[in-house]
């Protein structure tokens, strides 16, 4: 039987025994002719292409083409494991753009990550750094490869949840921009946060004091001991505002404050109501300093709250120059 994409899209070609099959069913059916799958892969329909990417009967070259947009589907495709067994150095044969996408996925084989780190290829290094499951040892290797004049790689390492404590403690010395990312990493331990405060906490922009105070590991006792909160009561309020289980009525009560760090903690909370977000916006919008890091932190806190209203978002677009 001669098969073509026009017939498939028109619904005139179906798998044997299933006259009611849709094009999507054809794309997902492992018994579909590989050449038909190759043709469906050229369609603009996103879902059809995703289904072809997950089909074990899809030709290998077509899989690699689809892997740029559908890396998870490729990794979950049963044929992928077979290809690894058949080709011991499979990773070296995968097109660069496809490999870059695969490296950022949770299910990518560990030997792929190791291969990429050993290449002299900056885009592959970045892909590995952006994978949230990259182990600490590889992150250390990436940090050593990072160039001082291009800090995107070291920033990705600084934000990584698996970055080892000793590595974080080292890279905060690179500069304030890297230290800021480390301070925002929720996995950064207190000992590193304390180092950041000691090194950068005295600058005019209060960004580091604020970031450390907002960190989930900073308890009321630590907030007082590190001079991050004005009073014990304020430290307790900040701790409550950082707890995921705190309800909207409690957050509304906490909002009756003139302490900006507590206000930011409230704005960042998922349970803060639209009314409280607007109230705090009115309170804080009058105190910004054009272009400061603290301003950007404030604005991004509002951007990331789903309850921020459209009028406020319009103001934020202008302030952040979106």
Report residues per predicted region:
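Alpha-helical scaffold segments
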Residues: 1-322
């Amino acid at each position: 039987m001669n098969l073509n994409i026009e017939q498939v899209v028109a619904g005139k070609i179906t798998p044997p025994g299933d006259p009611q099959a849709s094009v999507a069913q054809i794309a997902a059916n492992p018994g579909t002719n590989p050449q038909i799958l190759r043709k469906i892969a050229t369609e603009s329909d996103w879902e059809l292409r995703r289904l072809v990417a997950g089909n074990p009967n899809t030709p290998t070259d077509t899989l690699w083409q689809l892997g740029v947009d559908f890396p998870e589907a490729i990794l979950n495709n049963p044929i992928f494991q077979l290809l690894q067994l058949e080709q011991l150095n499979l990773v070296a044969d995968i097109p660069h753009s496809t490999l870059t996408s695969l490296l950022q996925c949770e299910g990518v084989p560990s030997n792929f990550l190791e291969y990429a780190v050993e290449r002299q290829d900056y885009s592959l290094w970045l892909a590995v750094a952006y994978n949230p499951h990259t182990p600490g040892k590889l992150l250390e290797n990436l940090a050593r490869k990072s160039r001082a004049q291009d800090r995107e790689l070291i920033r990705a390492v600084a934000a990584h949840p698996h970055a080892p404590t000793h590595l974080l403690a080292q890279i905060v010395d690179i500069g304030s921009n890297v230290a800021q990312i480390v301070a925002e990493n929720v996995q950064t331990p207190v000992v590193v946060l304390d180092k950041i405060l000691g090194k950068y906490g005295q600058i005019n922009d209060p960004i580091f004091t604020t970031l450390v105070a907002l960190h989930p590991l900073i308890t009321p006792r630590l907030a007082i001991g590190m001079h991050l909160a004005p009073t014990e009561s304020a430290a307790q309020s900040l701790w409550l505002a950082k707890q995921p289980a705190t309800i909207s009525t409690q957050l509304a009560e906490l909002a009756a404050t003139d302490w900006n760090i507590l206000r930011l903690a409230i704005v960042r909370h998922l349970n803060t109501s639209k009314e409280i977000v607007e109230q705090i916006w009115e309170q804080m919008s009058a105190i910004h300093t054009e272009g400061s890091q603290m301003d950007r932190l404030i604005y991004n806190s509002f951007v990331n709250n789903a309850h921020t209203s459209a009028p406020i978002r319009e103001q934020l677009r202008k302030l952040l120059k979106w």
